[in-house]
Design a protein with these regions (language model features):
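RNase H-like two-metal-ion nuclease catalytic core shared by retroviral integrases
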Residues: 111, 197-199, 205-209, 221-244, ...
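C-terminal domain-tail junction helix/linker
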Residues: 213-215, 239-301
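Short, amphipathic alpha-helical "recognition" segments used to contact nucleic acids or chromatin
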Residues: 1-13, 51-58
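Active-site beta-loop-alpha junctions of metal-dependent nucleic acid enzymes
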Residues: 143, 147, 165-188, 204
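RNase H-like polynucleotidyl transferase catalytic core
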Residues: 101-107, 195-199, 213-233, 247-255, ...
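Two-metal-ion RNase H-like nuclease active-site motif
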Residues: 122, 133-142
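Short, flexible loop/turn motifs enriched in small residues
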Residues: 13-16, 144-150
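Basic, flexible linker segments flanking DNA-binding modules
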Residues: 20, 27-130, 228, 285-295
Length: 301
């Protein structure tokens, strides 16, 4: 490009071949550039489609190359040729869509060494063949202007859908029970499912165990306190949630607890469950994968 600019305005002296050699540019590449420099960028329609995807939801700008590629495959924008994943990545780099995660949240629950523990029924296998077979649950905290907000959720291992969600300004056992109540109210067929958690006092409490037994759910716990990998999938969900919705987007310390509740509820129930591209689901949002599963059962019947 330097050589082309100089030759166009006539301020360069000497042979072009000399400058090509000095700048380590082949004469063939230089001539090709001259022929194509005024041509439209061949990936412009693809770039426009990517930017449109980012504008659909405020959290879509956190898509990396895999989820962006999956989003393009799912939406199939009219008139846009979808190249391979590596080309998608290069175009993303070109237009500045090169999001990189910055932080990892830490767990906040503490184990009660004296409380009775349940067996580890998951054993780090977070896969499931059908909905409501295996579920995971955990709590995370967020600082607000008027205190801390604790968020408790139950995720389905089959499609990573949020089945139950509850929030409060304390992280007592009642919060986890409320999450379980909400999940069972929405999904009565949760009976018989495995629900895995860490060994926090909330999950070993009598209040929580009574609710587990009432709903006919099988309780599973980490094999030992401090082994974060035993509930790694849930920790990963919190990490993605905070990276996508909070970090670099909202200063939660300037927001009230009630404002955060509204923001988080909308993120999980509306965006996460129904519109967010999920790589673990082959690019399908959780509820889309769930609907496809039940549709396949009807077709088989």
């Amino acid at each position: 490009m330097f050589i082309a600019i100089k030759t166009d305005d006539g301020r360069i002296k000497g042979k072009i071949s000399f400058y090509c050699r000095v700048l380590h540019v082949s004469r063939q590449a230089f001539n090709k550039y001259l022929k194509t420099k005024d041509s439209p960028w061949k990936y412009q329609s693809l770039a426009d489609a990517m930017l449109d995807i980012c504008k659909e939801d405020e959290c879509n700008d956190t898509y990396g190359r895999i989820r962006m590629y999956q989003a393009l495959q799912l939406k199939q924008p009219e008139g846009v040729h979808i190249p391979g994943e590596r080309t998608v990545y290069r175009v993303m780099e070109e237009i500045g869509l090169n999001y990189k995660p910055k932080r990892k949240p830490n767990g906040i629950t503490k184990a009660d060494k004296e409380a009775r523990k349940s067996d580890d029924l998951i054993k780090r296998d977070f896969t499931a063949k059908k909905p409501l077979e295996k579920c995971i649950t955990d709590i995370t905290e967020i600082k607000a202007s008027d205190g801390k907000l604790y968020v408790s959720a139950i995720f389905d291992c089959y499609d990573l859908a949020v089945l139950g969600l509850a929030m409060d300004t304390n992280m007592k056992a009642a919060l986890c029970k409320q999450t379980l109540d909400n999940a069972y109210r929405a999904y009565p067929t949760l009976r018989g499912a495995i629900l895995h958690s860490d060994r926090g006092t909330q999950y070993t409490s009598e209040l929580y165990r009574k609710a587990i037994n009432k709903y006919g759910i099988l309780q599973s716990m980490n094999s030992a306190s401090g082994r974060c990998h035993d509930n790694a999938r849930c920790e990963s969900m919190w990490a993605r949630f905070k990276e996508e919705l909070l970090y670099g987007r909202y200063d939660t310390t300037t927001m009230t607890v009630e404002q955060l509740k509204t923001l988080i509820w909308r993120y999980f129930i509306s965006y996460w469950n129904n519109r967010r591209i999920c790589s673990a689901n082959g690019g399908l949002p959780p509820m889309v994968k769930r609907q496809q599963y039940y549709a396949s059962l009807q077709e088989a019947a």
